[in-house]
Curated annotation (Swiss-Prot):
This is Ceramide transfer protein. Residues 363-592 form the START domain. Phosphorylation on Ser-132 decreases the affinity toward phosphatidylinositol 4-phosphate at Golgi membranes and reduces ceramide transfer activity. Inactivated by hyperphosphorylation of serine residues by CSNK1G2/CK1 that triggers dissociation from the Golgi complex, thus down-regulating ER-to-Golgi transport of ceramide and sphingomyelin synthesis. One of its GO terms (cellular component) is Golgi apparatus. The gene is CERT1.
Length: 598
């Protein structure tokens, strides 16, 4: 059949494929996500022979690559929000990469796609070659082995279709024969009528004959048979009209019977396919249900590693999981700190404590005016009682310690001012502020610092410090650059106590610029201490049982980056009271049995 022939020959002719040159090799520096501790690190990346490899640096390529992936089946995904980032995934392995700028990223993506295309998996020419082979095999076999084995009645259907094709040819021949017969008959009748009309016209001029009764008749009957002989059309003497009609009826009956059989076979095939379709739909329903269950279980598991789960407004981790991760990390740090404190013996340097007069002077450094302004603001506003203020919320109360918070947000970033009051027996304000300000003992009581150093010493009572805090995943690591000043504020009257204050506030310095590793936080913190002395009995000397230190601690912190508000407030509520208790206990421990420092 013509249709079958055209189907068999489809796909046998193709345009010759154009050969393209080999893909261009590429190498350069990209930032690669290493892990949640070290974050993004610059790596030397080489694209060659359908393989992407990376080295620690260009100088260390001779030592071998640190990792490589084949790009044949890799999936390259540009990030939705970060214009410089793109991800490459092969099965369960995912590389997170960042370029210098969007144009640089697009160049890398194009080069990787070219290597992937030339590998054969992503090539259109490869797909065309495979498709042509399938078409040729299908054309040679007529029907695929799968379809013929799936339905054995398919042979009967094809046979019936062939029979219908034969019936069609027979019917066409019969119709042509009958049509020819009718055309010849019509031509013969037309010629006969034309001849009769001509003879009648010629006889109109003949004289009539007289009959015995006096009537006149035309004398034309004598030649009637000669004039109008019986005409038989030429070319139809060999046609059996009756036989052709019977055959025509039989052919149409055969076509109807074959059509009926084909319809019956197609109905049976449809029923079989419907059963298969129902089974496949049931399988699909089960698979979708299993997929939903697997995704639900996956969401319950903790997520680690990828930068998509870091802190930020586009983080894939929700607030509850974010808080759980932060809390778990803080608990681990506390356990490590407790273990290290119990195992090691602290080394203490005999730091001479200057007299109070050394900290009473204002100084002459370039930040003198700023320090004086900060000190006066804290002395004016920080010592005010906020217990009855509706804007301040009492979030923690443990014995003498009370912690207040005022909720403030700016551009989605939590900037809650915090204020805590406490009363500690056996220590003076000078001692508390000295231990809080001194960098020699900072690591003894501060457990959140990873490292710190003094950037510049401005005066005996003022220094600039740069410190990096330990990272708490999934939050980004923070660093702080601040000026720390300690001051003694003399009492205005004899009944007023002396006040010691340590003021820490953020500044800028050329020796500690911003870096990509940490988020720079801004702080304004003050530790304000006043010493109250109860007179001893009799003529006894003042002991530590007679002194009480009233502490006011205020903190205004800008975290420098986005994090869930509920998480920040929950962590602050947990960590600030813990810090005050740990620090005051440390001061009590270090001053016990030593002379009182007023």
């Amino acid at each position: 059949m013509s249709d079958n022939q055209s189907w068999n020959s489809s796909g046998s002719e193709e345009d010759p494929e154009t050969e393209s040159g080999p893909p261009v090799e590429r190498c350069g520096v990209l930032s690669k996500w290493t892990n949640y501790i070290h974050g993004w690190q610059d790596r030397w990346v080489v694209l060659k022979n359908n393989t992407l490899s990376y080295y620690k640096s260009e100088d260390e390529t001779e030592y071998g690559c640190r990792g490589s992936i084949c790009l044949s089946k890799a999936v390259i995904t540009p990030h939705d929000f970060d214009e410089c980032r793109f991800d490459i995934s092969v099965n369960d392995s995912v590389w997170y990469l960042r370029a210098q700028d969007p144009d640089h990223r697009q160049q890398w993506i194009d080069a990787i796609e070219q290597h992937k295309t030339e590998s054969g998996y992503g090539s259109e020419s490869s797909l065309r070659r495979h498709g042509s082979m399938v078409s040729l095999v299908s054309g040679a076999s007529g029907y695929s082995a799968t379809s013929t084995s799936s339905f054995k009645k398919g042979h009967s259907l094809r046979e019936k279709l062939a029979e219908m094709e034969t019936f069609r040819d027979i019917l066409c021949r019969q119709v042509d024969t009958l049509q020819k017969y009718f055309d010849v008959c019509a031509d013969a009748v037309s010629k006969d009528e034309l001849q009769r009309d001509k003879v009648v016209e010629d006889d109109e001029d003949d004289f009539p004959t007289t009959r015995s009764d006096g009537d006149f008749l035309h004398n034309t009957n004598g030649n009637k048979e000669k004039l109008f002989p019986h005409v038989t059309p030429k070319g139809i003497n060999g046609i059996d009209f009756k036989g052709e009609a019977i055959t025509f009826k039989a052919t149409t009956a055969g076509i109807l019977a074959t059509l009926s059989h084909c319809i019956e076979l197609m109905v049976k095939r449809e029923e079989s396919w419907q059963k298969r379709h129902d089974k496949e739909m049931e399988k699909r329903r089960r698979l979708e249900e299993a997929y939903k269950n697997a995704m639900a279980e996956l969401k319950k598991k903790p997520r680690f590693g990828g930068p998509d789960y870091e802190e930020g407004p586009n983080s894939l981790i929700n607030e509850e999981e974010f808080f759980d991760a932060v809390e778990a990390a803080l608990d681990r740090q506390d356990k490590i700190e407790e273990q290290s404190q119990s195992e090691k013996v602290r080394l203490h340097w005999p730091t001479p404590l200057p007299s109070g007069d050394a900290f009473s002077s204002v100084g002459t450094h370039r930040f003198v005016q700023k320090v004086e302004e900060m000190v006066q603001n804290h002395m004016t506003y920080s010592l005010q009682d906020v217990g009855g203020d509706a804007n301040w919320q009492l979030v923690v109360e443990e014995g003498e310690m009370k912690v207040y918070r005022r909720e403030v947000e700016e551009n989605g970033i939590v900037l809650d001012p915090l204020k805590a009051t406490h009363a500690v027996k056996g220590v003076t304000g000078h001692e508390v502020c000295n231990y809080f300000w001194s960098v020699d003992v900072r690591n003894d009581w501060e457990t959140t610092i990873e490292n710190f150093h003094v950037v510049e010493t401005l005066a005996d009572n003022a220094i600039i410090i740069y410190q990096t805090h330990k990272r708490v995943w999934p939050a980004s690591q923070r660093d702080v650059l601040y000026l720390s000043a300690i001051r003694k504020i003399p009492a205005l009257t004899e009944n007023d106590p002396e006040t010691w204050i340590v003021c820490n506030f953020s500044v800028d310095h050329d020796s500690a610029p911003l870096n990509n590793r940490c988020v720079r936080a801004k702080i304004n913190v003050a530790m304000i201490c006043q010493t109250l002395v109860s007179p001893p009995e009799g003529n006894q000397e003042i002991s530590r049982d007679n002194i009480l230190c009233k502490i006011t601690y205020v903190a205004n912190v800008n975290p420098g980056g986005w994090a869930p508000a509920s998480v920040l407030r929950a962590v602050a509520k947990r960590e600030y009271p813990k810090f005050l208790k740990r620090f005051t206990s440390y001061v009590q421990e270090k001053t016990a049995g030593k002379p009182i420092l007023f």
